[in-house]
């Protein structure tokens, strides 16, 4: 008979898929309940075991009971033994009888004794078993006192914690105290330390320093090779900032600071790490995600501690502690502070996107006003780079806030370099880009009705997918919106102008005024129209006061015309006072003064005459061309080139000024060169005779420009300039031919051609030649003695 076939089949995959969710949940709950019950049972057993061990340790073991020996039976039966006829028995029989009497315990025992025969044996066995169960202690192990600590909770439950403390008997404690007293009383002679020579100290320092360098390099290489796995080594590397060996402490700390800076620059991610929420911490994540979280947490903590260490080094240097340190001398704190500032500046520029960037700005920017020149220059250069590289405006806004607070807290008693940093802001570039984008035609956003009317169904589908893709790309690139950029720039400008206006109002005689005027000249086109009238009135008062230097007055003029050339075009204002002031002060430029003011004057002329050509009269243009030609004779060659280039632009902008090239006078009156009013000096009755002198100038480029202007500044023909000169502005030519570095452009040729001169022969009469020869012989034969005359005068 065949065996019965098992008709029960394994459930198919389709059947498994049909399993209800409720059933699966119940299975999961049962499984979890079993796991919890087994864990609870395990915890209960562990608890019972700990309690048993604790009870056994607390009890004092009882000594073993001594078994009482019975009295020999011979004494009890002495009388009976005496009655036996021993003389009739042999010695061997007597000995045998004694042995048999000892073995027959049931005959010789006392019947009145209530205890059973083998009672002592059972009692002895119980005592032995009891002591076998107790834990044994060796003789060498001392007694210990159990101290209960705070319990620990893990996933299995609460685990009690204890600590054992050895108990010292009172006798031993007294003996130890006596031994200590005797040790203190006995004076042990100390061996004097051997004094190392200078060479040995240098060798020891070199060996120690090489060991520290190798250790630093090993740690840094390990961190850079696998940052996520070796993040703990950052702590070990950072701990070397507390080097205690006096011979290498300063050098090692400097090396560690620089090494940590490079390590953080390499391993820092390109995003800002945010703290995790409670829900994110409680949620279960993948192993890789958990590893990344641990790396980010360790990186943030070590980066924070590193910045705190750098800050503490700066504080120690500023306070110049009176407490002498055995490791680092007071003189060495300055070197450590310079390295710390260098690291902070590098981190501020390189990691502008990372955490704690604002904290670094608060530390670095105020150091621009520091007395130490090296530290001030480091922080100044880093702040300049930060302003130039800032694309979104967050870092610039934070730095400007710090500068404004510093100026206000010091009551405007800061160095001018602090405010000059604001000239490197990129706000002007952003605003120019914004204007061009506003002028460009914008794409019209189609509404739903327009799409339905103008596009087919497939086109609408593609349009929707394209818009979705664009949104995703914007989110992926994390691009800042234009509105947000503009908002940040506006807020930054408000703080800058607030600082400038405070100084104009409260500290007009401060050393910061030139920087304020220079900043206003740069950002004047961004000022709100509501402030134009008040600002122009303030500038008028500053010029009329006469307290300004030449450069400050030029900045005032430049600021006023920048205001009027921007949004001020809508204002109907004639800045005649500013034209008159510049015309009057142009002779302040000369070869004996600083050459930097020429660049500001060229910028003012460009804004006043070229950009405002429609508001400039012909008389004013003629007066400025004549005065600039005269000024070109009194300045250095680079300034002459810039001034002649400005004259070229003016002659091309105002064609009727070519009458200055004609010697015939027109109109009434004569030219008044000393008059300070350009409208009434009668410049049309003069001529540019200065060009003939400039054509013989020692600089070849000045000669070229003078000849070009004498020909009427043509754009084509034989008298036209070369392209390399005609396409450049006056400011660019001034910078190209600058003599700041004591160089001559173009270079002077080494060989100078010598002109052949014809020797001229003079025929003298014979009598005259004889007379000259006689006089020469007479003079050579005379004895000249000056000493006698000198002695006579002294007496």
UniProtKB/Swiss-Prot annotation:
Q: Where in the cell is it found?
A: Nucleus, Nucleolus
Q: Where is the composition biased (Basic and acidic residues)?
A: 22-39, 46-58
Its GO CC terms are: nucleolus
* UniProt KW keywords: Coiled coil, Nucleus
Give the UniProt record's GO annotations in the biological process aspect: DNA replication initiation
Q: Please give the SUPFAM superfamilies that the UniProt record associates with this protein.
A: ARM repeat
Under the heading InterPro entries, the entry gives: ARM-type_fold, CCAAT-binding_factor, Noc3_N, Nucleolar_cplx-assoc_3
Q: Which PANTHER family does the annotation name?
A: NUCLEOLAR COMPLEX PROTEIN 3, NUCLEOLAR COMPLEX PROTEIN 3 HOMOLOG
Protein name (Swiss-Prot/TrEMBL):
Nucleolar complex protein 3 homolog
Q: Which organism is it from?
A: Xenopus laevis (African clawed frog)
Gene that encodes it: noc3l
């Amino acid at each position: 008979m065949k065996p019965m076939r098992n008709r029960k089949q394994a459930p198919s995959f389709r059947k498994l898929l049909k399993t209800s969710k409720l059933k699966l949940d119940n299975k999961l709950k049962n499984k979890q309940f079993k796991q919890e019950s087994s864990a609870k049972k395990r915890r209960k057993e562990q608890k019972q075991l700990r309690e048993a061990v604790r009870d056994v340790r607390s009890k004092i073991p009882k000594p073993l009971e001594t078994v009482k020996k019975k009295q020999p039976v011979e004494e009890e039966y002495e009388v009976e033994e005496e009655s036996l006829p021993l003389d009739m028995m042999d010695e061997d029989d007597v000995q045998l009888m004694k042995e048999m009497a000892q073995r027959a315990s049931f005959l010789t025992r006392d019947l009145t004794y209530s205890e059973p025969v083998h009672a002592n044996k059972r009692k002895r066995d119980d005592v032995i078993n009891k002591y076998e169960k107790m834990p044994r202690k060796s003789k060498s192990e001392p007694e210990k006192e159990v101290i209960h600590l705070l319990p620990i909770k893990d996933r299995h439950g609460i685990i009690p914690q204890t600590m054992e403390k050895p108990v010292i008997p009172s006798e031993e404690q007294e003996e130890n105290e006596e031994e200590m007293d005797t040790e203190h009383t006995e004076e042990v002679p100390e061996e004097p330390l051997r004094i190392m020579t200078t060479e040995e100290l240098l060798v020891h320092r070199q060996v120690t320093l090489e060991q520290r360098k190798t250790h630093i390099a090993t740690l840094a290489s390990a961190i850079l090779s696998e940052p996520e796995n070796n993040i703990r080594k950052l702590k070990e590397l950072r701990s070397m900032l507390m080097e205690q060996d006096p011979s290498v402490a300063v050098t090692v700390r400097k090396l560690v600071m620089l090494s940590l800076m490079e390590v953080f620059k390499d391993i820092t991610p390109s995003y800002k790490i945010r703290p995790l929420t409670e829900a994110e911490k409680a949620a279960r994540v993948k192993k890789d995600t958990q590893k990344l979280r641990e790396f980010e947490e360790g990186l943030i903590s070590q980066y924070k501690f590193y910045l705190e260490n750098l800050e503490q080094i700066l504080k120690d240097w500023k306070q110049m502690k009176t407490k002498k340190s055995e490791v680092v001398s007071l003189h060495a704190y300055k070197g450590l502070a310079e390295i710390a500032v260098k690291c902070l500046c590098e981190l501020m520029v390189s990691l502008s996107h990372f955490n704690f960037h604002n904290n670094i700005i608060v530390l670095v920017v105020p150091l621009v006003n520091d007395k130490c020149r090296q530290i001030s220059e480091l922080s100044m250069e880093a702040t300049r780079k930060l302003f130039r590289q800032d694309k979104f405006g967050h870092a610039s806004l934070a730095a400007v806030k710090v500068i404004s607070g510093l100026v206000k807290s010091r009551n405007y008693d800061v160095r001018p370099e602090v405010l000059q940093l604001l000239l490197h802001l990129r706000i002007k570039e952003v605003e120019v880009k914004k204007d061009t984008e506003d002028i460009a035609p914008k794409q019209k956003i189609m509404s739903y009705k327009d799409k339905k009317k103008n596009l087919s169904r497939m086109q609408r589908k593609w349009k929707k997918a394209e818009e979705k893709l664009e949104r995703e790309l914007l989110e992926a690139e994390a691009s800042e919106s234009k509105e947000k950029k503009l908002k940040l720039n506006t807020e930054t400008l408000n703080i800058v102008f607030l600082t400038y206006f405070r100084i104009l109002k409260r500290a007009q005689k401060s050393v910061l005024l030139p920087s304020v005027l220079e900043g206003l000249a740069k950002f004047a086109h961004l000022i709100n129209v509501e402030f134009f009238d008040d600002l122009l009135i303030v500038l008028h008062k500053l010029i009329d006061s006469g307290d300004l230097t030449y450069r400050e007055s030029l900045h005032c003029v430049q600021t006023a015309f920048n205001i009027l050339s921007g949004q001020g075009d809508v204002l109907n204002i004639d800045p005649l006072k500013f034209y008159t002031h510049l015309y009057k002060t142009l002779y302040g430029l000369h070869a004996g003064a600083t050459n930097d003011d020429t660049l500001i004057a060229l910028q003012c002329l460009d804004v006043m005459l070229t950009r405002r050509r429609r508001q400039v009269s012909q008389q004013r243009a003629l007066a400025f061309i004549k005065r600039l030609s005269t000024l070109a004779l009194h300045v250095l060659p680079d300034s002459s080139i810039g001034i002649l280039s400005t004259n070229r632009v003016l002659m091309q902008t105002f064609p009727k000024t070519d009458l200055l090239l004609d010697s015939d006078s027109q109109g009434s009156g004569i030219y008044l060169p000393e008059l300070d009013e350009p409208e009434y000096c009668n410049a049309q009755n003069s001529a540019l005779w200065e060009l003939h002198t400039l054509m013989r100038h020692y600089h070849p480029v000045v000669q070229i420009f003078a000849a070009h202007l004498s020909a009427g500044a043509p754009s084509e023909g034989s008298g036209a300039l070369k392209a390399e000169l005609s396409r450049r502005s006056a400011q660019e030519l001034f910078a190209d031919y600058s003599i700041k570095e004591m160089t001559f452009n173009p270079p002077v040729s080494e060989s100078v051609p010598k002109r052949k001169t014809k020797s001229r022969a003079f025929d003298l009469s014979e009598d005259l030649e004889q007379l000259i020869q006689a006089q020469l012989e007479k003079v050579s034969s005379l004895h000249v003695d000056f000493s006698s005359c000198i002695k006579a005068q002294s007496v």
